[in-house]
């Protein structure tokens, strides 16, 4: 069969872009050759509906072992009693959690998308805001941080069945123990979505949700540095609070409802090549080298936030505890969209992002979100953060000057072109 030169030329073009540029999108990272090898393996040919030992297809002896390894490694990595490695994405993991815990119309309490939450935490354009009744908490206008007393007030008033502790653009650690107190006070299930800080949490560098939250979900890329996919965890299994029973009349455990919500409730055949890649990534994350990486990632984020503050940029909440920061650009007289477009021309990729109490649309925004996961994988350290912030500042203060932008692009290429994609 003739090689598809059009597609493979574009893949090479994208590889060149990744090698020569600065990747600062907080949700992106680079995987190891071994993770890519597993994701591109013959396992993509295998259908395996069901779970290990309970498949609807023959010939699953090998993939059963692979999936069980992925499950066992995920449980070891996070100290969990239960893991489901089949969700194709974080959004589908969250969908399964909702289906297992809720009925249509039930009230959910989540982090407002415009303050740093995620689409699947109740946004009206998402299934979570259409099938359920969403109410929201946000950050304090002065501090840019969560106000747990205010969250308690909202929970007491609205009586949600599910409380979501998680974010896509919040740079501070979360107090899961306080969230659990709030959830218990109203009889709600506490569900943590740790898709962004999962790698830091797994290595003990941020608060651990597993002892406090009934259910935890995460993506397997971002700071976990695995393939794109989802994962559901529980520290301990428990009887489902809805009182649903088996055909024999026994109360179903939540693990059973979660498994059923993933398959057949939400998905058909699992992606065995991606599950194998997840297993490889979990194995990498269990090693000491990953702890070194996670610590450096956090140090880089702090150094970058400090450098931005010194140059007069407004970091929401004043800094960061994790791998990212949300920058309000209103005092710089540039929109998030303008900043993103100018930086992309300079081969620096960030994403425009709404900031709390934003007065611009989601297509324009007043801010950008910046993260250090990918550049840390490439071997950059604290001293490089000042250089990067200086380059960003140069672009943003000259965002209509094509000559300056081209000059910065050359500096970026010089900084990055000789660095490996995967340094750890």
UniProtKB/Swiss-Prot annotation:
PROSITE patterns, A to Z: SHMT (PS00096)
MF terms in GO: glycine hydroxymethyltransferase activity; pyridoxal phosphate binding
GO CC annotations, alphabetized: cytosol
Keywords, comma-separated and alphabetical: Amino-acid biosynthesis, Cytoplasm, One-carbon metabolism, Pyridoxal phosphate, Transferase
Site for Plays an important role in substrate specificity, residues: 221
Positions with a binding annotation for (6S)-5,6,7,8-tetrahydrofolate: 113, 117-119, 361-363
Keyword Amino-acid biosynthesis in annotation: yes
Top EC group: transferase
Metal-binding keyword on record: no
Biological process terms in GO annotation: glycine biosynthetic process from serine; tetrahydrofolate interconversion
The protein's annotated pathway: One-carbon metabolism; tetrahydrofolate interconversion; Amino-acid biosynthesis; glycine biosynthesis; glycine from L-serine: step 1/1
Documented EC number(s): 2.1.2.1
Family the entry assigns: Belongs to the SHMT family.
Role this protein plays: Catalyzes the reversible interconversion of serine and glycine with tetrahydrofolate (THF) serving as the one-carbon carrier. This reaction serves as the major source of one-carbon groups required for the biosynthesis of purines, thymidylate, methionine, and other important biomolecules. Also exhibits THF-independent aldolase activity toward beta-hydroxyamino acids, producing glycine and aldehydes, via a retro-aldol mechanism.
Name assigned to this protein: Serine hydroxymethyltransferase
Gene name for this UniProt entry: glyA
């Amino acid at each position: 069969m003739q090689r598809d030169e059009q597609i493979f030329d574009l893949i090479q073009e994208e590889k060149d872009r990744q090698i020569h540029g600065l990747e600062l999108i907080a949700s992106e990272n680079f995987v190891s050759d071994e993770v890519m090898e597993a994701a591109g393996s013959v396992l993509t040919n295998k259908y395996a509906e069901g779970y290990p030992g309970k498949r609807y297809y023959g010939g699953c002896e090998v993939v059963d072992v692979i999936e069980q390894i992925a499950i066992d490694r995920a449980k070891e990595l996070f100290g969990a009693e239960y893991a489901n490695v089949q969700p194709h994405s974080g959004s589908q993991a969250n969908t399964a959690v909702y289906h297992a815990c809720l009925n249509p119309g039930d009230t959910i309490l989540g982090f407002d998308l415009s303050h740093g939450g995620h689409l699947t935490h109740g946004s009206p354009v998402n299934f979570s805001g259409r099938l359920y009744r969403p109410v929201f908490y946000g950050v304090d206008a002065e501090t840019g941080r969560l106000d747990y007393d205010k969250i308690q007030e909202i929970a007491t008033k609205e009586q949600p069945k599910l409380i979501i502790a998680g974010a896509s653009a919040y740079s501070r650690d979360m107090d899961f123990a306080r969230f659990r107190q709030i959830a218990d006070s109203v009889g709600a299930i506490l569900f943590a979505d740790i898709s962004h800080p999962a790698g830091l949490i797994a290595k003990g560098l941020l608060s651990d949700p597993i002892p406090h939250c009934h259910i935890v979900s995460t993506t397997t890329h971002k700071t976990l540095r695995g393939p794109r996919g989802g994962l559901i965890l529980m520290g301990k299994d428990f009887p489902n609070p809805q009182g649903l029973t088996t055909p024999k009349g026994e109360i179903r455990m939540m693990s059973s409802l979660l498994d059923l919500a993933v398959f057949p409730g939400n998905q058909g055949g699992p992606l065995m090549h991606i599950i194998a890649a997840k297993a490889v990534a979990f194995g990498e994350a269990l090693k000491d080298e990953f702890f070194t990486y996670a610590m450096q990632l956090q140090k880089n984020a702090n150094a970058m936030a400090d450098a931005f503050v010194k140059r007069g940029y407004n970091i929401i909440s004043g800094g960061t505890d994790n791998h990212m920061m949300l920058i309000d650009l209103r005092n710089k007289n540039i929109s998030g969209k303008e900043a993103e477009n100018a930086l992309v021309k300079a081969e620096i990729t960030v994403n425009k992002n709404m900031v709390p109490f934003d007065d611009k649309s989601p297509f324009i925004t007043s801010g950008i979100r910046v993260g250090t996961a990918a550049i840390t994988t490439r071997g950059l350290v604290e001293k490089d953060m000042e250089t990067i912030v200086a380059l960003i500042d140069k672009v943003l203060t000259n965002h209509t000057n094509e000559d300056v932008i081209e000059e910065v692009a050359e500096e970026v290429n010089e900084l990055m072109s000789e660095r490996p994609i995967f340094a750890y």
